[in-house]
Amino acid sequence: MHTNRPYRHPSLKRLRYRKRLPPNAALICLCLLPLLTGCVRTPIKYLPVPPAPIPATLLDDCAPPVISEHMTWGDSLVLNEQLLLALEMCNQDKAAIRRIEEQKNDSQK
């Protein structure tokens, strides 16, 4: 039993008889669609960055120069130079610590 009619899938037959949506309903659906997609986003959570530790070399004690018991005037001048150098090195360490603390305070604001 062969017929000359072309083959049609049953679902295509249903599409012919289906009611169409009114244009207003289609517009409402199009307007509601962005609202649904807007709810999908997850909030961005920023994690605090731990502060950088101060290097141990900056926290070391400043070693004073050794003072000998018998000093000459020349040895006294050398000792004064060594003391001033040790003081300058300590001041540089303290300035570096202050810069690190300022950077921490600036990043926390």
From Swiss-Prot:
Pfam families: LysC. This is Putative protein p16. The lineage of its organism: Viruses, Duplodnaviria, Heunggongvirae, Uroviricota, Caudoviricetes.
